[in-house]
């Protein structure tokens, strides 16, 4: 298999796009609710990347509770009944949207308080004309690929929408939300610049990748990569032996130099394919 260069220098900053969002300046879903908030706002979030983005913008001013445990498959997650109590107390409920968390969205709509607001970040940020349908998210199923946050630009757009919503609810802390957003944006911009600079040395036609989970469609579209395939099938189960064999053939025929794994979906299949 032809390799453009030792791809560790390319893989690391690319995977850092996910790491940036998951860590979001050091915060994670478990720690987000720890500070004593100054605003009194209670915010509910769904998946860990969104929890982290909200925590990065909110700082210590907001109580944040994530509903989807970190490391959980959000595509198959069903909220526990006790999540209804949290949703009933939340002033703002941030979800990704784009059909990712429909069970949680339904629970939120049924239980939110009268002045509580549900904000579907991806649905607001992404025009329908820019929806990506692919091998894991076929258009006939009506669910676009929802993974905007692995692209730094979309992560910034999420953070800016969070900033606006928090500032509207808590104008006394608007300046801090703005400052936190600007710090987040600076890190995301730095990451994007590093990725573009790094991949500039890759020979033409070699910007191809295979992922375990189909989470890089928007990143690939914005950075000029081609996602050849994903190891995990659209059912989100482990691939069958025949599916693995077919993907290996595809990787070899396409000359794919890069395979991205996932902390959320660890799998021994990666080593077999690589």
State where each predicted segment sits:
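Extracytoplasmic metal-acquisition and chelation regions
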Residues: 3, 24-274
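Sec-dependent bacterial lipoprotein signal peptides
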Residues: 1-23
């Amino acid at each position: 298999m032809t390799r453009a260069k030792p791809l560790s220098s390319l893989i690391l900053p690319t995977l850092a796009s996910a790491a940036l969002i998951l860590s979001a300046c050091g915060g994670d879903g478990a720690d987000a609710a720890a500070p004593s908030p100054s605003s009194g706002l209670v915010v509910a979030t769904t998946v860990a990347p969104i929890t982290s983005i909200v925590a990065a913008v909110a700082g210590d001013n907001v109580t944040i509770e994530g509903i989807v445990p970190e490391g959980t498959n959000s595509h198959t997650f069903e909220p526990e009944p006790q999540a209804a109590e949290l949703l009933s107390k939340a002033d703002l409920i941030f979800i990704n949207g784009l059909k990712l968390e429909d069970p949680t969205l339904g629970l939120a709509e049924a239980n939110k308080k009268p002045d509580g607001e549900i904000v579907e970040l991806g649905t607001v940020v992404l025009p329908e004309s820019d929806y990506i349908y692919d091998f894991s998210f076929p258009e006939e199923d009506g669910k676009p690929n929802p993974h905007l946050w692995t692209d730094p630009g979309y992560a910034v757009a999420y953070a800016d929408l969070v900033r606006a919503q928090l500032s509207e609810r808590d104008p006394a802390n608007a300046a801090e939300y703005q400052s936190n957003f600007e710090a987040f944006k600076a890190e995301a911009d730095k990451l994007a610049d590093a990725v573009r600079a790094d991949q500039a040395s890759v020979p033409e036609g070699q910007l191809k990748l295979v992922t375990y989970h189909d989470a890089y469609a928007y990143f690939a579209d914005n950075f000029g990569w081609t996602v050849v395939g994903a190891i995990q099938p659209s059912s989100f189960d482990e691939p069958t032996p025949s599916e693995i064999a077919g993907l290996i053939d595809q990787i070899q025929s396409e000359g794919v130099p890069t395979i991205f794994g996932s902390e959320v979906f660890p799998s021994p299949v990666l080593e077999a394919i690589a």
